[in-house]
Amino acid sequence: LPGMAERTVILYTFSKKFAMTGWRLGCAAGPAEVIDGISKHNANIESCSNHFVQMAGIAALRGPDEPQQGIVAELRRRRDTLVDRLLEIDGVKVTRPETTFYLFPDITEVYQRKGYQNSTEIRREALEKTGVSFCSREHFGRPLPGEDKVFVRFAYSGIPVDQIEEGLERLAAFWE
């Protein structure tokens, strides 16, 4: 589109395609003045990535595509397992995302049925009773005005399918 290059910034991380979650490696492409501002801001938040991470990123970019196809297939298996198991729990609603390794299910009905007063309470009790850990909505900022649903976040990038199934079996028994 005309004028888009001058006002578009593309952010890229190595987390999904190369399974480098936690390595904090990525890049930004866009107009020079915007990238300069991002660089100055970023330098004040964190120092540069360490050398071995930079070298791993270069190797990932230059390497063959086949390993990424396996990574993506495995993440899809994990996603599908988690979504399917969550949908089996009475009172949980969740959509199947296309390109992420997080889920944000709506657990409002579970929350109300169990009589919780806040989402920190449901998160802590689930961890204590089932060993399943997830983030509450508050980890991502204050709820918006009028927000009345209870959402939590599950991450599945580093968890094998058998552990997802086992954890969701325990969580389902606890929540139902």
Can you say where each PLM-predicted feature lies in the sequence?
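PLP-dependent class I/II
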Residues: 1-176
